[in-house]
Amino acid sequence: MELSSFQSYLIILFVVLIIISIFVFRQFLKTRSEELNLVKFEQKGLDSLTQATELYEFGSIQIKKRLYPEAIKTFLKAIENYENEPDEAKAIINNALGFSYAAQNEFKKAIKYYKSAIKSLPEYPIALNNLASAQQRLLEYDLAYATYQKVLMLDPKNKTAIKKSKELEKRINYKPYKGIKDKGF
């Protein structure tokens, strides 16, 4: 049995629609799950949450929903309650708090918490990348370049650090035009 071009077109269209439907449904389930978790945490209330891990999870959901001021409050409370947590958890919470501040263009505060994250876990390339990005936003190009170089020592294949350090290298080595006499006339 031979398929006409119209039948082939319909089959291909049907397969494409099924694939798109699967992706849309998966995204719907993911978003619904996040929304339900957010509602669950909001119903509990910030005051009833005392575990740093719960607070981190709540703050992460708030970041995904771009509720940065609320996430800052949540992460600050997590920091108050994380004395018994491992250094890795402390670093992740401090990095998330720094990210929340950076998202609101409060880069000096962000740098403070990125440095706390790095103090807890010195070989944490994500916090180092975020620190360098905040330094770059504050026009501290030499510091940002040095920080990206630290990232590259830890992770030579880090795409963000490679790209940003090349950009900063061009910016740092840039020499403005000095006039006609230097042109050779």
What does each of the following model-derived ranges do?
Residues M1-T53, S60, L67:
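Long, contiguous interaction/recruitment modules in multidomain scaffold/adaptor proteins
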Residues A52, P86-D87, A91, P125-I126, ...:
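Helix-start (N-cap) detector for alpha-helical repeat units in TPR-like alpha-solenoids
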Residues K64, A103, R137-L138, E167-R171:
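Register position in tetratricopeptide repeats
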Residues L3-I18, M153, K157-F185:
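Terminal, low-structured helical/coil segments at or just beyond the last alpha-helical repeat
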Residues L55-F58, Q62, T74, I93-Y101, ...:
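TPR/Sel1-like alpha-solenoid repeat signature
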Residues K44, A78, S116-A117, K150-V151:
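Canonical positions in the second alpha-helix
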